[in-house]
């Protein structure tokens, strides 16, 4: 896969460095056999241009297809997951009727099985779970967002006034797969707020309360 080498070499040149610690494939390429991609990735590792390999937006079968041909281990899978995006928690169709997880993908189960670290982008649902944005009336997920925010706010007092943002991140951090939320902001205070989520020890009962609120249905 020539584009893989072109991509990493371009990144190295732009940053003025000799290697990257982690190189992640942004998404699967349906027009390239995974054996071809794996061969190029292994060359990059052997040449010292890349230390570790990860993937992004890969479903379990896609990860297995790449892993079959790859000598280097896959150490990360960067995925969209939050209380508003629950699919990675489920295997197959384990979600409830009418819930946002009615067709789960089981990524987190695979991460546990294969010792892959899940990296969560959009951990507060594109900002909606901060509670600082007004949800438009025509937003397709308005009811779900508001129900989840209500549950987060009701839980605040039990965790020393934790914000919805902090509790939403703490919910991810509590999962046994070892999720690492990817957060960012131009505001240092927002960074401090999100970092403080790591100090919250969410109880099992409260974790499930948030899950039920986010699903919009009881857990079977």
Which residues fall in each region the model found?
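Beta/alpha (TIM)-barrel catalytic core signal, keyed to glycine-rich beta->alpha loops juxtaposed to Asp/Glu
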Residues: 30-220
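Active-site groove signature of glycoside hydrolases
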Residues: 12-33
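Short, acidic/polar
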Residues: 1-15, 61-64
């Amino acid at each position: 896969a020539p584009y893989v080498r072109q991509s990493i070499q371009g990144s190295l040149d732009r940053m003025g460095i000799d290697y990257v610690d982690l190189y992640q494939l942004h998404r699967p390429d349906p027009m390239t056999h995974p054996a071809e991609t794996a061969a190029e990735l292994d060359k990059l590792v052997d040449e010292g241009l890349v230390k570790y390999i990860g993937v992004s937006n890969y479903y379990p079968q896609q990860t297995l297809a790449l892993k079959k041909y790859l000598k280097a281990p896959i150490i990360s899978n960067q995925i969209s997951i939050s209380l508003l995006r629950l699919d990675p928690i489920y295997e197959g169709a384990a979600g409830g009727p009418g819930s946002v997880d009615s067709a789960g993908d089981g990524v987190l189960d695979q991460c546990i099985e294969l010792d892959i670290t899940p990296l969560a982008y959009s951990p507060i649902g594109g900002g909606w779970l901060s509670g600082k944005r007004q949800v438009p009336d025509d937003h397709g997920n308005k009811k779900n967002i508001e129900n989840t925010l209500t549950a987060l706010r009701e839980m605040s007092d039990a965790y020393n006034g934790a914000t919805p943002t902090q509790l939403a991140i703490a919910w991810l951090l509590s999962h046994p797969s070892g999720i690492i939320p990817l957060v960012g902001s131009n505001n240092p205070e927002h960074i401090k707020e999100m970092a403080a989520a790591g100090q919250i020890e969410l109880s099992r009962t409260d974790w499930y309360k948030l899950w039920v609120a986010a699903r919009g249905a009881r857990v079977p």
